[in-house]
Amino acid sequence: MSLSGLRDELAQVRTKKKEFLEQIERIVPWGRWIAMIKPCYYKGERGNKPYDLELMLRLYLLQNLYNLSDEATVAEAMDSRAFSEFCGVESSNQVPDGDTLGRFRNILVHNGLQEQLFAQVIKLLREKGLLLKKGTIVDSTIIAAPSSTKNQDKQRDPDAHQVKKGNEWHFGYKAHIGVDKDSGLVHTLKVTAANVHDVTMTSKLLTGEETVVYGDSGYLGAEKREDAIITNHSGKHIRYKINRRPSQMKKGSARSQAQLKRREHEKSSVRAKVEHVFGVVKGLFRYRKTRYRGLRKQTAKLNMLFALANLILADRRCLLA
C-alpha cells in the first residue's frame, strides 16, 4: 500500500475518541452557547485580531471533557487528529497558546458564564419535556483539593475544607446536586467546601414543584429543619423518602425488619440514578481532584461539567432526538 493510501485509510478509522467527539459535536447547543458568550468576548477593535470564538469554546470543552491543563489542551489540538478535526484546525498556526486559553476561561469565570451555560442546558431539557419536576433525588460528592502546602503561596486552598467520611479525612469541595427522579438529569447544582453537611443544603436543591424527595441517610431530618420545604408550589405535601441508617434496620421482629428492608431497597433503587451523573463527571471526565483554587473557579468548573454530563446522559437515553 502506498503512503497516500495508508494515510487515507487511517483517516477513515473511527476511534473511540473520534466517536465520542462526534457525539459532542451533535449534542452541544453551539448556537445558543456562542450567542451567550459573544457579548463578553473580545470585540477585536484594538490590537491583534482575537481567535475565533467557536474555536476557543471548542478548545475549552475539550479541556473539560479530558481534564487537561491549558498547555496539554493546545498540544493535543495540534497532535491529535480527532482533536484537530473537532476544532476545525489544519495547522499549529491556527491554534492559540495555553495562556490564551487560560484567559478565555477566566473571561467565562469572571462573567459567570459557566453557570449560564448550565442554566441554558436546563432550559433546553425543560423545552424537550425531560425534567418532569415530580420528584427530586438529592446527593453530593467530594472533589478533592491538594492538601500540600508545597506551592507558590505556601498554603492550602483557603476556600476548601476537610471532612471525615467513614474512617478517612478528605480535603476539598463538595458538589451538591438535585436530580430529576424520572430522567436522572441534574436540575440544580450547588458547590461548597467539603465540610458543609448534606442535610443543610436540601432546600437549596429542590425546585419547589416536586411531591417527593429521595436521599441517603445524610439527609435524615431534612423535613424538620427551619428552612425545610414542606409543601410545593401547588400546595401539595412533599414526602421525604430518606434512607435509614443501617443501625435503624435492626430493631423489631424479623417480619418488620424484612418489610423495612424492602422499603429501603425501593428508595435505594430510585436513588441509584444519581450515580450515573457522578459516573460521568468523575469517571468519564476523570474530574476527581481540583485544578484551580477558590470556590468561585470550582463552582464555574463544576457547572460546565454537569452541563456536559446532562447532555451526554440525555443523549445516551435517546432523549434529545
Outline where the language-model segments fall.
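Amphipathic, well-packed alpha-helical segments that form the structural scaffold of globular domains
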Residues: 34-42, 122, 278, 282
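Short helix-capping/linker segments at secondary-structure and domain boundaries
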Residues: 65-72, 185, 284-290, 310-321
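Secondary-structure capping and boundary motifs in well-ordered enzyme cores
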Residues: 29, 47-54, 93-96, 266, ...
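A positively charged, amphipathic N-terminal helix/segment that binds anionic biomolecules
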Residues: 21-35, 40-48, 55-71
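Helix-centered, glycine/charged polyanion-binding patches within enzymatic domains
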Residues: 211-212, 217-296, 300
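A short glycine/serine-rich beta->alpha loop
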Residues: 42-47, 90, 292-295
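Polybasic low-complexity intrinsically disordered regions
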Residues: 53, 62, 71, 75-78, ...
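Charged, often Cys/His-bearing segments associated with DNA-binding zinc-finger transcription factors
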Residues: 1-31, 35-39, 320-321
